[in-house]
Amino acid sequence: GISADQAKALKDDIAVVAQNPNGCGKALFIKMFEMNPGWVEKFPAWKGKSLDEIKASDKITNHGGKVINELANWINNINSASGILKSQGTAHKGRSIGIEYFENVLPVIDATFAQQMGGAYTAAMKDALKAAWTGVIVPGMKAGY
């Protein structure tokens, strides 16, 4: 698990991001495809499309919003999220999205939060996100693979 201070920092963090889930989610996917261009092939709706085409898609905004809301759910329930995380692992395995994508996406989330929050994204929040991601979220999802 993570400490009470880390949980609080994470909840403060996601509270800011969750005020604009669609905008932040879209930014997250754009950043993900900028940092990992090959990952777009894992998304049937965007496979073979340019980043500009993806940016113009309503689907990126809608799916991005769902992802941010789900991430908020994980974070707000971080110390009791094992069931949610396991089911998300199983769901993503069923879509042929391996756990390695989740193991390697933290730099994307970190960069997106920094971009979206600016100076409000503190070192404590960054450290808490890393601790939660590597110590709770990825292991929880692995249980579903």
Curated annotation (Swiss-Prot):
Assembly behavior: Monomer.
Domain Globin: 1-145
Name listed for the protein in its UniProt record: Globin-1
Record keywords, A-Z: Heme, Iron, Metal-binding, Muscle protein, Oxygen transport, Transport
Source organism: Liolophura japonica
Binding site for heme b: H63, H92
Signal peptide as annotated in the record: none
GO molecular function: heme binding; metal ion binding; oxygen binding; oxygen carrier activity
Family: Belongs to the globin family.
Taxonomy, superkingdom: Eukaryota
SUPFAM superfamilies with a match to the protein in the record: Globin-like
Matches recorded under Pfam families: Globin
